[in-house]
Amino acid sequence: MADDKKIIFSMVGVSKAFQANKQVLKDIYLSFFYGAKIGIIGLNGSGKSTLMKIIAGLEKSYQGEVVFSPGYSVGYLAQEPHLDDEKTMKEVVMEGVQSIVDTLAEYEEINNKFGLPEYYEDSEKMDALFARQAELQDIIDATDAWNLDSKLERAMDALRCPPEDQPVKNLSGGERRRVALCRLLLQKPDILLLDEPTNHLDAESIDWLEQHLQQYEGTVIAVTHDRYFLDHVAGWILELDRGEGIPWKGNYSSWLEQKTKRMEMEEKVASKRRKTLERELDWVRMAPKARQAKGKARLNSYDKLLNEDVKEKEEKLEIFIPNGPRLGNKVIEAKGVAKAYGDKLLFDNLNFMLPPNGIVGVIGPNGAGKTTLFRLIMGLETVDKGTFEVGETVKLAYVDQQHKDIDPAKSVYQVISGGNELIRLGNRDINARAYLSRFNFSGADQEKLCGMLSGGERNRLHLAMALKEEGNVLLLDEPTNDIDVNTLRALEEGLDDFAGCAVVISHDRWFLDRICTHILAFEGNSEVFFFEGSYSEYEENKMKRLGNEEPKRVRYRKLMED
């Protein structure tokens, strides 16, 4: 997957099946070149993580051959990385530079030996010490080891790692992933395998990571649904489709164009998926001003969206979101709201007014109070000061991150259908299995017990549960986490055609840019800024307001010298 680089890794006829009738990978032949940047995309369950585990050497049960060129190292970021719970955060990060730590320790040990009689009275031992000291000095100079502490601080700051003395056993899932990523980047393996690297990173950390990987000398292979990440970093896209591995040269936007053309040649009648791809490609090709105009037009088209023919929408969209009852002019208004937990003030004097058909993206660092905002609106927690005024016509539908209302003992089909073959959706009865298929649950997947679902599958199921409740105001907490690009694209279109108001917590910049009419930004220091416009427009506005001097902003610097 490059034109003039050395092949460092090949897969020859690799196949993998989990059951006799479910082959995930089929006879894959691929060669990877040193320095290539490869993004892997495909539906959930298409074998992306399995492929990564095969390359990492963690999955041994497969057919075919995996061949590495000698002398190359491999590093792997799993979705749930293993960390030593007995260590502190910094001790785990330092594992990534253990060879440098060992070199410095040996250098200090040699210096101490110079003062011992058994060495300075023996010329041969002294010569050996001087020789070894010179070797170590060369290594220290080459790796800039004297500045190791500042590099560790830079890496931990860039990825928003928790305090360095924090015990690993007390870290959240997101914190563990950030610590594992920090350790891996410091290791600098020749082949860097990243499974959903942008999950649990805020926008500034993602921006830093993109710049780091653009300059990374080795090969980077990343499974991700973050399309801006794929656009900025990837030089190749590897699509996994029904077991086949299809390489495409270029970034995500290039793949979108090539894929659309290929589907156009293969299909006599345009499928829903092809039309969805074509509409996303149209958006990619839009000039910034045209995108802005599209967002503003939505705010003036409530009646048009509300009165669109439901059957036409269902035929057009992969994910159809029923509009719910008609919204009045008042949706939700925050007036002087404040909330704190002990000494930690999340926000103070929060004010905003949601428009009837706006799509509001909620952004900010982890722990800033975004989920708390939703819980306050839902009445699950109480404000310390101020009020949330909810309009009389509002019917809320809430998708949270915990998915607590999913019964682990029931199947996916039982949870959605409630034992009925037909479910009510948008004043129409539709087949429950057909509804589930829109969220990428095929026949066998619909019979899975909910307790056995992956994170992405649970996310899709909860989304399907909430959207069929026919709310006219949707509160979606990280709906884009752990779902594949196809489902993301379908969700974007469903929201774009939804006549009501949606408030969406997400770190997915492409998603935010494509659908949002407003941004509610948690900017630090308990400040929350409500902005009319897309994510990109908000970023421009933020730069004008805060400039490069804004102290929370991570500016890119290399972790280690080459």
Q: Predicted segment positions?
A:
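ABC ATP-binding cassette signature C-motif
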Residues: 1-271, 315, 322-562
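Intracellular alpha-helical coupling/juxtamembrane segments of multi-pass membrane proteins
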Residues: 258-291, 295-301, 305-312
